[in-house]
Amino acid sequence: MTSSADLTNLKELLSLYKSLRFSDSAAIEKYNSLVEWGTSTYWKIGVQKVANVETSISDYYDEVKNKPFNIDPGYYIFLPVYFGSVFIYSKGKNMVELGSGNSFQIPDDMRSACNKVLDSDNGIDFLRFVLLNNRWIMEDAISKYQSPVNIFKLASEYGLNIPKYLEIEIEEDTLFDDELYSIIERSFDDKFPKISISYIKLGELRRQVVDFFKFSFMYIESIKVDRIGDNIFIPSVITKSGKKILVKDVDHLIRSKVREHTFVKVKKKNTFSILYDYDGNGTETRGEVIKRIIDTIGRDYYVNGKYFSKVGSAGLKQLTNKLDINECATVDELVDEINKSGTVKRKIKNQSAFDLSRECLGYPEADFITLVNNMRFKIENCKVVNFNIENTNCLNNPSIETIYRNFNQFVSIFNVVTDVKKRLFE
């Protein structure tokens, strides 16, 4: 029988296999180790180890330099490397997250702008973007024929956010140390946090990356959320001294297995610290971590893509959309609106609150039932006041994991439907 840990490994192997074309060396190494594990465990798994892939970003970036070094004379372009989730937009014309291989939906105007940039130069291999706090910025543009600066200028004309950059001529051998690093970093005077610096020498394609940092451990006092947009909240990790550790998104929080009132490993930069996610940080399974973090954040929030959103009015909007009636701000307005339509009223009467709420959110029925069968509910006055997942192994199914991460919203809609039924028919 396949164990929970085996299923997690196989799921990660499949995800990495799908994203090999956009993998860096660390992801390829992880993929090969999982292929080796899978072959020894199951004899034949249908995929093979790889040495090279058609488009690996490691082809364009040298190994990171984390100690002072001498930089040769020449003309250079320096670029910031931003903190956040890294995405690649290529000739396939879709935004793919580096490492996970997950496709990401972007606004139509952004997609159109990216396509125009790609179509302007047949030599562009890909555009590199960073997503942080629900904001996109182009970080790099890889072209065989021209400097990224030219592509940045064009991208800016099409409305894309572009990085600050610095063009310098270095006339003699120069020590690239912490002082020079800080001077260059300060010249990038935008608000995005920068984790390192990359540079390109004129006439060369490969980027050199400089990252001066120190590892440290910090005590976590609390895990909260910060508002970054219209009902969009990003996880926030607070230390005992009140300092904030930077977190990319919900998945970053999960991978790091961060827990309140424990120490976590961080990368310390000059002005901020970054939550460091690495294998071996505790023995919890992914499902156990997801359950704990959702419990920590509380029942007022649900996972919405990479971030959290607050339950409430969003559920009412989805319910009115499902019923094809006018939007309502309160349950009273919803009841009045339903009373205007005999068809809608009959639908509410004949369909269970359970099924209507599930359909409203578009959950697959079989996966939803599997999740519910692994949960225990506390019901008062026909409403769900609390729930607990008793077996997190079912979260190894990605679809079930997504439903569970969103389950607080289901409960909110279910309770609204229950309230509406009571007012209409009792």
UniProtKB/Swiss-Prot annotation:
UniProt keyword list? DNA replication, Phosphoprotein
A Pfam family (short name) is: Chordopox_A20R
Entry-linked InterPro entries: Chordopox_A20R
Annotated GO biological processes are: DNA replication; viral DNA genome replication
**Functional note:** Plays an essential role in viral DNA replication by acting as the polymerase processivity factor together with protein OPG116. Serves as a bridge which links the DNA polymerase OPG071 and the uracil DNA glycosylase.
**What's the subunit arrangement here?**
Interacts with the DNA polymerase catalytic subunit OPG071. Interacts with UDG/OPG116. Component of the uracil-DNA glycosylase(UDG)-OPG148-polymerase complex; OPG148 and UDG form a heterodimeric processivity factor that associates with OPG071 to form the processive polymerase holoenzyme. Interacts with OPG117.
Instruction: Return the similarity comment.
Output: Belongs to the orthopoxvirus OPG148 family.
Protein name stated in the entry: DNA polymerase processivity factor component OPG148
